[in-house]
Amino acid sequence: AGLLAAKREGEPGAPKIPVEIFKAGDRFQIGAFEIEAINVTHSIPEPVALAIRTPSGLVLHTGDWKIDERPVLGKPTDEKRLREIGDEGVMTLVCDSTNAMREGVSPSETEVAASLRDIIQKAPGRVAVTTFSSNVGRIRSVALAAQDCGREVLLMGRSMRRTVDVARELGYMEGVANFLTEQDFGYVPRDKVVIILTGSQGEPRAALAEHALEAVHLSQPHVDAAHPRRIAGAA
């Protein structure tokens, strides 16, 4: 809801649209449908699955989700409630399938944070990390890892700055220091800075693709840490 409000404020003349806020555990009625929100874990804050009870049967829409017992934001996926809904009987499952064909288990974001800290600690110069602007958990992990290594952080990309501003207002950036401005960036030693920017999927309007690094030059030695895998249809 905070991101919706921020986006509307950034669009001159945008109509005021009423927004009803609900959270995990809530149930509400829309016409013939009863909808229950179930807590799940993902890279964005406050993700939920929706159990939609219809006259014909129960539909479970997972939204984006993963099993992470140690998330950096929010609570773990409510596996107990999902089992209960499964026992109730699900007519249709609409499920996020990203990386479903890959074998193995997705690492916890807490494990990723530890790896990031190790990479940043060993880097001889600047470190640049690309991620989705919506991935508040990863942005927080990178920022805290940078702080632990005595580095300051520069955000690049309008959507990322907007997301982080909202996340800070809502308390998701607790413990994260203020970020550098591009004006101050040039005065910070190369081994004392980390850049977080959009463009991990090759999006044409992202900070990386629009040559944002012309203003923030990465000369050798530096480390590029592009974490997200390519997602079909993302660019």
Pin down the residues of each PLM region.
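His/Asp/Glu-rich metal-coordinating catalytic cores
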Residues: 1-191, 200-219, 235
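Short beta-strand segments
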Residues: 196-198
